[in-house]
Amino acid sequence: LLLHIVARGRIGRSAEGELVDRYVKRLSWPVRITELPDTGGKLPLVEGQTRIVMLDERGELMPSLALAERLGRWRDDGVREARFMIGAADGFDAAERARADVLLSFGRATWPHMLARAMLAEQLYRATSILANHPYHREG
């Protein structure tokens, strides 16, 4: 299962960028990061079995264990790609949200998209660590 982060805006050399790099390097699963301009830009084609997850403040509050279970189920079901979409400052419109398989929220607060990218990278590392029975995640 490819973990594909598609994000609006360039993270560049920043504290958030360093965090993203740190967690992506730790991941044992294949990862791709695609950066798009804040507006426009061509979204990568959706090929084969792909699940679209959009980060959105109206989305599902998903504990780390639930995210791990979802990724594990997709992997076991032969899903080829889990595509995690991070919008620009204004997020996604209703039509874009309707095309998502999952709307995922990191809480009801609004997060800067660069920080949301770092949080997503950490949660993906945590979820894959849970699936590998690695001691990184501590429940409770």
Region locations from a protein language model:
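N-terminal beta1-alpha1 ligand-phosphate binding loop
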Residues: 1-24
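Short glycine-rich anion-binding loops that position phosphate/pyrophosphate groups of nucleotides
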Residues: 11, 57-60, 88-92
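Conserved strand-to-helix beginnings and helix N-cap segments that scaffold or border functional pockets
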Residues: 16-20, 64-68, 97, 117
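Structured adenosyl-cofactor binding patch, chiefly the S-adenosyl-L-methionine
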Residues: 94-140
